[in-house]
């Protein structure tokens, strides 16, 4: 049946209307188009994968590469050049996440108020410029200042990832995309490790005009700037503005997303959704889970090169020994991310991942043979699995744009707290074995297992309660009433487990 003239308006016009009147575009289109069959659904999903995911993956890779520069630099001369003594190096990682934590919540509101891809690209370019300028530092204080500023600029990126994935993919599709994004951290580690080793070899040949760690910052910074520019040009702020979709495809993408009963959200800030998030026990579970899994991450992300060197590997060999961890990370996270495509049991995956993490931590802490400890370091590449589960849960198990942004920011504060604490578990008085830090990894992973079980129990119980009540959205509700409903407000919403 042909549309009437009134119905046959363009998605572009509605996108503009949504932007001006703060209306939820997905709700406006919800009932305007036919049911999407499996073939069409696959086609739309594939097109999104081809046009949106690649640049998001590059952001993830370069972000990890940028954060890892301090780890590589720790054995490339930066501690000597900047006269670091005692526990001063610990504060390199802590200062980064201090800036990240303090500004994560206020800066994430920019994603709510302004175009998503434009804000994201601006911060990427800014952090790339700062990375490049880090080559100019000549004191410990100035280096700590740049790391703090870098943390501030990168605090926007993870909440942006959550929103990008939520506005382009359905709930059951989000876990793999989030896992694949984080898996690209592994490729970032491989690229950074390769560059570091190459610079180390050039240094041995006396072919460098400045310290290798300074050149490393220049290269990673310039790559990041270029990527930020491409984000600005290539990725649309929302599906209704996608230059790579036809008008009909834009309509269908929005219809496809609306089947989750979550819409694309309103750009209007809603205080009641923040209050609702504060009443949601999941937010606190996500927060403490982030702390538990981030403490080992914060420690090893900054000290793995030093610890590998202390196992007996020379500088160049220590840089190479970091690379298998990155390879395992990319392969394992990609494979683990595919499992929910068939079973949709992400909490089971989190528990399996944490069991492997616990094994990794135990090998690092208690194994005597060097090769067993090395195996523990390599298995650490699987450690982001619970982190992915948290991001995926926030993306798919919280509805309402303001609530989603707020819960993501609070979760990232927990992530920052853990990453701030992690480097501080490495005390110079315990060098070179750092046994206290290693034992803390084991304790944290045990705590994380109990929190994952609690999240699973909360979601299963609530789904059963809603199934028993068997309530539906009233047909008498106006479009205004249906806009930007939260998961608490929408009785048809079900939590993914």
Swiss-Prot record:
Gene3D superfamilies: MFS general substrate transporter like domains. InterPro entries: MFS, MFS_dom, MFS_trans_sf. One of its GO terms (biological process) is transmembrane transport. GO terms for cellular component: cell division site; cell tip; Golgi apparatus; membrane. GO terms for molecular function: transmembrane transporter activity. It is a multi-pass membrane protein. It comes from the Eukaryota. Keywords: Golgi apparatus, Membrane, Transmembrane, Transmembrane helix, Transport. Its main location: Golgi. It is found in: Golgi apparatus; Membrane. PROSITE patterns: MFS. The chain crosses the membrane at residues 91-111, 119-139, 149-169, 179-199, 215-235, 283-303, 319-339, 347-367, 374-394, 406-426, 439-459. Belongs to the major facilitator superfamily. Allantoate permease family. PANTHER family: ALLANTOATE PERMEASE (PTHR43791:SF1), PERMEASE-RELATED (PTHR43791). This is Uncharacterized transporter C1773.15. It comes from Schizosaccharomyces pombe (strain 972 / ATCC 24843).
């Amino acid at each position: 049946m042909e549309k009437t003239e009134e119905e046959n308006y363009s998605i572009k016009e509605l996108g503009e209307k949504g932007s001006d009147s703060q209306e939820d575009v997905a709700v406006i289109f919800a009932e305007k188009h036919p049911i999407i069959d499996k073939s069409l659904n696959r086609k739309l999903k594939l097109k999104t994968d081809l046009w949106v995911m690649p640049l998001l993956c590059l952001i993830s890779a370069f972000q990890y590469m940028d954060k890892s520069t301090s780890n590589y630099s720790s054995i490339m001369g930066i501690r000597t050049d900047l006269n670091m003594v005692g526990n001063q190096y610990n504060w390199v990682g802590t200062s980064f996440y201090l800036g990240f934590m303090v500004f994560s919540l206020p800066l994430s509101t920019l994603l709510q108020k302004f175009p998503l891809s434009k804000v994201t690209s601006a911060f990427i370019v800014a952090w790339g410029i700062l990375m490049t300028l880090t080559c100019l530092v000549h004191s410990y204080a100035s280096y700590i200042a740049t790391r703090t500023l870098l943390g501030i600029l990168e605090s926007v990126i993870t909440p942006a990832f959550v929103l990008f994935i939520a506005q382009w993919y359905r709930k059951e599709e989000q876990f793999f995309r989030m896992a694949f994004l984080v898996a690209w951290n592994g490729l970032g580690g491989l690229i950074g490790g390769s560059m570091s080793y190459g610079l180390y070899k050039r240094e041995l040949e006396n072919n460098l005009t400045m310290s290798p760690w300074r050149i490393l910052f220049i290269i990673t910074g310039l790559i990041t700037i270029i990527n930020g520019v491409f984000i600005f040009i290539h990725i649309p702020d929302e599906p209704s503005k996608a230059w790579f979709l036809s008008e009909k495809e834009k309509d269908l993408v929005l219809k496809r997303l609306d089947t989750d009963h979550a819409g694309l959200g309103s750009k209007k800030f809603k205080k009641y959704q923040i209050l609702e998030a504060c009443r949601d026990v999941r937010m606190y579970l996500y927060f403490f889970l982030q702390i538990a899994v981030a403490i080992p991450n914060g420690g090893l992300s900054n000290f793995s090169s030093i610890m590998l060197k202390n196992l007996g590997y020379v500088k160049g060999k220590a840089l190479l020994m970091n690379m298998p961890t990155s390879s395992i990370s990319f392969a394992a996270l990609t494979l683990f991310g595919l499992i929910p495509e068939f079973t949709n049991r992400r909490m089971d995956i989190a528990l399996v991942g944490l069991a492997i993490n616990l094994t990794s931590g135990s090998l690092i802490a208690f194994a005597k043979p060097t090769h067993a400890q090395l195996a523990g370091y390599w298995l650490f590449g699987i450690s982001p699995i619970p982190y992915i589960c948290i991001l995926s849960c926030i993306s798919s198990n919280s509805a309402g744009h303001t609530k989603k942004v707020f819960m993501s920011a609070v979760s990232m504060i927990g992530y920052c707290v853990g990453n701030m604490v992690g480097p501080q578990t490495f005390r110079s008085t315990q060098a070179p074995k750092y046994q206290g830090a290693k034992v803390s990894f084991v304790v944290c992973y045990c705590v994380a297992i109990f929190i994952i079980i609690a999240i699973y129990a909360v979601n299963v119980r609530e789904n059963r309660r809603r199934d028993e009540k068997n309530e539906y959205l009233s047909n008498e509700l106006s479009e205004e009433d249906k806009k930007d409903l939260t998961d608490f407000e929408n009785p048809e919403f079900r939590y993914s487990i």
